[in-house]
Curated annotation (Swiss-Prot):
The lineage of its organism: Eukaryota, Viridiplantae, Streptophyta, Embryophyta, Tracheophyta. Keywords: Cytoplasm, Detoxification, Phosphoprotein, Stress response, Transferase. GO terms for cellular component: cytoplasm; cytosol. It comes from Arabidopsis thaliana. This is Glutathione S-transferase U1. CDD domains: GST_C_Tau (cd03185), GST_N_Tau (cd03058). The gene is GSTU1. It is an enzyme of class 2 (transferase). Induction: By acetochlor, metolachlor and 2,4,6-trinitrotoluene (TNT).
Length: 224
């Protein structure tokens, strides 16, 4: 009996770091998938049906399985398609990759986006506090090609989709050079390495379009 053909669909949004990181993993592993672009202000009935709880992207549909939340989707992809592993095999290194991923999506996103834009304590204070957090990642990637070592891994996908290809576009749009090379030589080297990875290049949002979008979001938050 012939094996049932696999079906992989990803509901995403071009500017979402959360769906872009899932695309990176699928491309890296060579998994054929159908990409369905969502218009987030006008969510499709399919998105509302598949993710009625959060009504957000990404949503991965693998045959009859529906998966939500980018970190969990990345782990599912890694365990389902074994080639080109993205999570460390060592239990401690795996736990630390998860720790830093949560640090990025919780602390750096919160401080480097909404808190910075609102700047209730002053913009310069918010900038320095954000840089203090980024310095932890600077130290973590020192001496490595990628956070994952010699090859791109789970943490590179989380950090890459969020920092250089999302938040940095916001910072650029509001006139902040958040990661100057003289302060963050290792992070800047890592970003250059990341941009050379084929699976990543195809998932980087258009720069000027992203800057324009992030700047508009910042203006909305600031005036709220």
């Amino acid at each position: 009996m012939a094996e049932k053909e696999e079906s992989v669909k990803l509901l995403g949004f071009w500017a979402s770091p959360f769906s872009r990181r899932v695309e990176m993993a699928l491309k890296l592993k060579g998994v054929p998938y159908e990409y369905l672009e969502e218009d987030l202000p006008n969510k499709t009935p399919l998105l509302l049906e598949l993710n009625p709880l959060h009504k957000k992207v990404p949503v991965l549909v693998h045959n009859d399985k529906i998966l939500l939340e980018s970190h969990l989707i990345l782990e599912y992809i890694d365990q389902t398609w074994k080639n080109s592993p993205i999570l460390p095999q060592d239990p401690y290194e795996k736990a630390m990759a998860r720790f830093w991923a949560k640090f990025i999506d919780d602390q750096i996103l919160t401080l480097g986006f909404r808190s910075l834009v609102k700047a209730e304590k002053g913009r310069e204070v918010a900038i320095e506090e954000t840089r203090e957090l980024l310095m932890f990642l600077e130290k973590e990637v020192t001496g490595k090609d990628f956070f994952g070592g010699k090859t791109i891994g789970f943490l590179d996908m989380i950090a890459g989709s969020m920092i250089p290809f999302c938040l940095a576009r916001l910072w650029k749009g509001i006139g902040i050079d958040m990661i100057p090379e003289e302060k963050f030589p290792e992070l800047n080297r890592w970003i250059k390495n990341l941009e050379e990875v084929e699976a990543v290049r195809g998932c980087i949002p258009p720069r000027e379009k992203q800057i324009e979008r992030m700047t508009k979001i910042a203006e909305t938050i600031k005036s709220a």
